Curated annotation (Swiss-Prot):
GO biological process terms on file: pentose-phosphate shunt, non-oxidative branch
EC number, as in UniProt: 5.3.1.6
Pathway, per record: Carbohydrate degradation; pentose phosphate pathway; D-ribose 5-phosphate from D-ribulose 5-phosphate (non-oxidative stage): step 1/1
Keyword Isomerase: yes
Family the UniProt entry places it in: Belongs to the ribose 5-phosphate isomerase family.
InterPro entries in the record: NagB/RpiA_transferase-like (IPR037171), Ribose-5P_isomerase (IPR050262), Ribose5P_isomerase_typA_subgr (IPR020672), Ribose5P_isomerase_type_A (IPR004788)
Catalytic activity: aldehydo-D-ribose 5-phosphate = D-ribulose 5-phosphate
Positions of substrate binding: T26, G27, S28, T29, D82, G83, A84, D85, K95, G96, G97, G98, K122
Entry GO MF terms: ribose-5-phosphate isomerase activity
Superkingdom of the organism of origin: Bacteria
Alphabetical UniProt keywords: Isomerase
Task of the protein: Catalyzes the reversible conversion of ribose-5-phosphate to ribulose 5-phosphate.
Protein name according to UniProt: Ribose-5-phosphate isomerase A
């Protein structure tokens, strides 16, 4: 599995050119993309500026000597490469297994070319087997949890060392065990309108390419009408 993730990450790095502003994703597959960018910066003199999606990726990029800018300092990002937890046949996805969904979506939004790197196990017919992360403000989180429970969404707070996990932005995550999401756009719209929800892990209609590593090698899938 690690070898597949590395293949996908290294393949994605080939899309990075001199002078680009590059969004650096978070997670076990995006990690290899960031490592390869670091190698190219140091060994090939690649000239890029990175914008990170989590404190973990910031530390990784700094350790590799990749020049960084804050997202507030830029208007557009040329290319962002990130992982995904599930991708359906319509190129909608669930992200946020690494608890960085809010920053990931903020970086993805001004990106001209958005690429996901995954291993083939992440490609699914329908989203929902992977729990959907919902980032919520701490105030009123228990009430919101009960709302999700009554709706039958099987919520659970994301935990870390027996405490509720706190994201880089200071929020909680409620994971929804939905099994299947029949209408991802409608479900996203409902969450967007829910007071107390900061962001959710449905990334619908956002990605341009999905790089999939499998036993037969690497495939680059182009999203329709992108």
């Amino acid at each position: 599995m690690e070898a597949l993730k590395k293949m996908a990450g290294v393949t994605a790095a080939q899309y990075v050119k001199d002078g680009m502003i590059v969004g650096l994703g978070t997670g076990s597959t995006a990690y290899f993309f960031v490592e390869e960018i670091g190698r190219r910066v140091n060994e090939e003199g690649l000239q890029v500026v990175g914008v990170t999606t989590s404190s973990a990726t910031t530390k990784q990029a700094e350790s590799l000597g990749i020049p960084l800018k804050a997202v507030d300092e830029i208007d557009e990002i040329d290319l962002t490469v990130d992982g995904a937890d599930e991708v359906d046949k319509e190129f909608n996805g669930i992200k946020g297994g690494g608890a960085a969904l809010l920053m990931e979506k903020i970086v993805a939004t001004p990106t001209k070319e958005y690429i996901w790197v995954v291993d083939e196990s992440k490609m699914v017919e329908k989203l929902g087997a992977f729990k959907l992360p919902v980032e919520v403000v701490q105030y009123g989180a228990e009430r919101l949890f009960r709302v999700f429970e009554k709706a039958g969404y099987n919520p659970s707070f994301r935990m870390k060392e027996d405490q509720k996990l706190i994201t880089d932005m200071g929020n909680f995550i409620i994971d929804l065990d939905l099994k299947v999401i029949e209408k991802p756009f409608e479900f996203a719209e409902m969450l967007d309108k829910t007071v107390g929800v900061v962001e959710h892990g449905l990334f619908n209609g956002m990605v341009h390419k999905v790089i999939v590593a499998g036993k037969d090698g690497v495939k680059v899938l182009e999203a329709p009408s992108k």
